[in-house]
Amino acid sequence: MKKLSTYLFLLLFSFQTSSWADDISDFQIEGMSIGDSLLDYFTEKKIKKFFKADYYTNNEYTTIESLQLPSFEVYEYVAVTYYTKDKNYKIQGIVGDIDFPDNIGDCYKEKDKVVEQISELFSNAKKQNRNFKHNYDKTGNSKVNQTSFYLDEGAVAVSCFDWSEEYNDKNYPDGLRVSITTSNLSAWYRNKAYK
């Protein structure tokens, strides 16, 4: 638990922001920001070799998943999303994950702590709490508990994913996720990604 508390402390400071920042690109996850080029971090050859998510039915965006680098201090995994046709690989979304296998209760507790602290950072943002079934699990047994902070240029979300036993068995552990997305990417997730 001490390690997790350290993660959460670092999680908040990994945004590298102040309470006065109102530009979504001011926030970082593991040093990466919205609007950065992936080419600033990886060669094009390396980018093309990364695992690409294949569960979206619409391919307007590409998500590189399961990035794990020795320099990462907070997250077990990082995912980055960019426009599929963008040759500069400009980042449109960043996600950081911490697993809570078989322990969704602790995920909820830690999410509440993170949300409270992020609420202070985004005091002027519109805040929304939601519980919903994950679109990817057609059985409806996988659930998401999410708090979103809406900014002019995008959103920050803190979520606990409670995957069904079937998906846990497919190596989908329950976990905490912090994400930063542009407004366009958020709209794509809502309206096109799974349709």
Can you annotate each of these PLM segments?
Residues 20-63, 93-195:
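Non-cytosolic coordination micro-motifs
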Residues 67-90:
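Compositionally biased P/S/T/G-rich terminal and signal peptide-adjacent segments
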Residues 12, 71, 85-87, 138-140, ...:
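Sterically constrained small-residue positions within well-ordered secondary structures
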Residues 4-16:
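Sec-dependent N-terminal signal peptides
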